[in-house]
Amino acid sequence: MARSMTSLVAVVPAAGVGSRMKADRPKQYLQIHGKTILEHTIERLLSHPAITQVVVAVSEDDPYYSELAIAQHPDIVRVAGGKERADSVLSALRFLSLQQQKADWVLVHDAARPCVAHQDIDALIERCSSHETGGILATPVRDTMKRANAQQMIDHTVDRNALWHALTPQMFKAEVLTDALSDALAQGVAITDEASALEWRGELPALVQGCSSNIKVTQPEDLALAEFYLSREKDRK
């Protein structure tokens, strides 16, 4: 691990409702092995030796977070989340900018990715330590990709050779990411992840290949897969 990045802050946007899960609560509060997905995710981040603090952005009217044991953890800070992901990340970044000891770099990680491997975080930190902009974890596209027309029929096959699935964490300089998100939102630009804000400014974030097990729990069937990956890791310990 690069010596210049021995202390990092992770930002977790967790204000989404996860409607595609069709559950009685936001997906980050569904349980696996007696813990919520959010707890698994945050504990995975905080157990990494380079991450010293996690700032989690939660909806102000969220009734679940305060009931979690992690809500009282001294290295986990709750801030108000926003309507969109970018608003939540920006809220966390603005909180960090007001602290006496400001974070130079931040790792932004999805609340519903509880299976991220420490070795992938190591690789991301190592790559970003020598990259001007920062970078993201990603996996190369393996399947044949089709572009559809308006009638949901195949228009043409897309060349997959240069296509990657964007994952998280995504790691950038805190000040640069703050400016990029602020400017993009002010211009009405659609921001689906942090890298897209940097791309809009003409930056070229690095792609760091990560494990395909770093899934995002989005659909009901993803819950069983995340449980499998977490169980497999537990058995290895």
Curated annotation (Swiss-Prot):
InterPro entries reported in the protein's UniProt record: IspD, IspD/TarI, IspD/TarI_cytidylyltransf_bact, ISPD_synthase_CS, Nucleotide-diphossugar_trans
Pathway stated in the Swiss-Prot or TrEMBL entry: Isoprenoid biosynthesis; isopentenyl diphosphate biosynthesis via DXP pathway; isopentenyl diphosphate from 1-deoxy-D-xylulose 5-phosphate: step 2/6
PROSITE patterns registered for this protein in UniProt: ISPD
The entry's keywords: Isoprene biosynthesis, Nucleotidyltransferase, Transferase
Ribonucleoprotein is among the record's keywords: no
Site (Positions MEP for the nucleophilic attack) location in chain: R160, K216
Site location (Transition state stabilizer): R20, K27
Highest taxon of source: Bacteria
EC number annotated for this UniProt entry: 2.7.7.60
Catalytic activity: 2-C-methyl-D-erythritol 4-phosphate + CTP + H(+) = 4-CDP-2-C-methyl-D-erythritol + diphosphate
GO process terms (BP): isopentenyl diphosphate biosynthetic process, methylerythritol 4-phosphate pathway
GO MF, one annotated term: 2-C-methyl-D-erythritol 4-phosphate cytidylyltransferase activity
Top EC group: transferase
Pfam family, one: IspD
Function of the molecule: Catalyzes the formation of 4-diphosphocytidyl-2-C-methyl-D-erythritol from CTP and 2-C-methyl-D-erythritol 4-phosphate (MEP).
Family: Belongs to the IspD/TarI cytidylyltransferase family. IspD subfamily.
Name this polypeptide is given: 2-C-methyl-D-erythritol 4-phosphate cytidylyltransferase
Species this protein is from: Vibrio vulnificus (strain CMCP6)
Gene giving rise to this polypeptide: ispD
